[in-house]
Amino acid sequence: LIDKSEEFPSKKIVSIFVNPLQFDDSNDYMSYPKTIEEDLEALEKREIDYVFVPTREEMIENLTESNQLPWGFSNLLCGSYREKHFQGVQKIIRELFQIIKPDFAVFGEKDFQQYLLIKYINKQYFQKADFQIILSPTIRMDNGLAFSSRNIRLSDNQINHAAVAFQSIKNTVLDYFHETSLFNFENLIPQPGRITYQYVKLYNEKYLFDKHGLETDDNFKQKNFRLFIALVIDDVRLIDNYRVERYDVT
C-alpha cells in the first residue's frame, strides 16, 4: 500500500487499528495478529509523514450512527459469512476519514468487497469528487499466496498447503467456466478436510457494483469477471480474488 501511495503527490499517513467492531467472533479478534512494534519499526525505514495509532476508546466512544448498507454487504461473499462485519468496518472507516480528511486513500485488491465499501462510504457521506480511492494490486508470496496479516499464524507447511489449495480450485473453476459458461461450481469444490472452502464465487464486476449500491467506473467493465475464494486452513481464514478479463459469456 505504501509503494502504491508513492505514485500520488500527497502527505502520507499510515493508520494502524485493529477494529473490534468488524469481528463476529471474540476469539477471532483476540487471535488476530497485533504487531504494532514491528509495524512501527518497519515504517521507520519508509518515507512516511505520519502514523496514526488511535486507541480503541478514541475510535469507538463517539461514533456517529451509520445507515444500513446495501444488500450486497450482507448477502454476498464475506458479508454472507460474517454478520455485521461490514457495518463495523463502515463505522470505523467513516470516523477515520472524518478525522484525517484524505485526498487519496489506498486499499488492497485482496479485500475487494472492502474496497467497494470504501467507495460507498465516500458516495454516501463525503461526496468529494476530488477524493481518489486507489486500489492497490495484491502482493503475493513466491508460491502465489496473497500476503495477509493472518499468514503470521500459519506454519511454512500450512502456507504452502494454502497456496496449492487456492491455485488448484482457481484453475479448476476457471477451466470449467471457460468451457461451459456455467457458474454451478458446487460439485467442483473438495469436501472439507484440513481445508474447508467457505465460498468459491465468480461474479461480473458490474453486478458487484450494482449490488453494493455503486455505479461502475471506467476501470470495471461489463465483460470482466472476478473469482472470489474464501477458505479456512485449520482455524485460520484466508481470502483471495482474481480478475478474469475480457471473457464474453454472451
Which residue stretches match the model-derived regions?
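Nucleotidyltransferase catalytic core that binds NTPs
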Residues: 1-194, 207, 235, 242, ...
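Phosphate/ribose-recognition catalytic cores of enzymes acting on nucleotide-derived substrates
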Residues: 188-250
